[in-house]
Amino acid sequence: MALRACGLIIFRRHLIPKMDNSTIEFLLLQASDGIHHWTPPKGHVDPGENDLETALRETREETGIEASQLTIIEGFRRELNYVARQKPKTVIYWLAEVKDYNVEIRLSQEHQAYRWLGLEEACQLAQFKEMKATLQEGHQFLCSTPA
């Protein structure tokens, strides 16, 4: 049976577009262990939790961002399936916008750094092709949906 994890692709919008005309920045966290990979906040489902509850709990634990500080974007949910540590893994992501552009990030010990990044930079740091594709799909979804 595959390991199951859930998370949120957290983003914020600039009020004024940057020089490259982008307004969306994604939050990526750098793991403290292993290859120090960059991903959105995510974690394993605990017994009795549903997937979205897991995503919100993991976000709170890993970033300090509470559910009340986020808006979950309707209509976007992605399931990634891959092998991690020789075991099949399923990760489900939703898009979530921070309500406060300057929200404080408080990292857990699981992560050593965070960055807010435009799509191109986020895809460069996200080493896994499935994560890059999910970020691109999320960006495209946001750009085709009124803010």
UniProtKB/Swiss-Prot annotation:
GO cellular component terms given for this protein: mitochondrion
Cofactor annotation comment: Divalent metal ions.
Catalyzed reactions per annotation: P(1),P(4)-bis(5'-guanosyl) tetraphosphate + H2O = GMP + GTP + 2 H(+); a 5'-end CoA-ribonucleoside in mRNA + H2O = a 5'-end phospho-adenosine-phospho-ribonucleoside in mRNA + (R)-4'-phosphopantetheine + 2 H(+); a 5'-end FAD-phospho-ribonucleoside in mRNA + H2O = a 5'-end phospho-adenosine-phospho-ribonucleoside in mRNA + FMN + 2 H(+)
Source domain of life: Eukaryota
Enzyme class: hydrolase
Annotated signal peptide: none
Gene3D superfamilies the UniProt entry points to: Nucleoside Triphosphate Pyrophosphohydrolase (3.90.79.10)
Location of the Nudix hydrolase domain: 2-139
Cofactor: a divalent metal cation
One GO process term, biological-process aspect: apoptotic process
Motif Nudix box, chain ranges: 43-64
EC number of the protein: 3.6.1.17
Chain positions with N-acetylalanine modification: 2
Purpose: Catalyzes the asymmetric hydrolysis of diadenosine 5',5'''-P1,P4-tetraphosphate (Ap4A) to yield AMP and ATP. Exhibits decapping activity towards FAD-capped RNAs and dpCoA-capped RNAs in vitro.
Family the UniProt entry places it in: Belongs to the Nudix hydrolase family.
Protein name per Swiss-Prot or TrEMBL: Bis(5'-nucleosyl)-tetraphosphatase [asymmetrical]
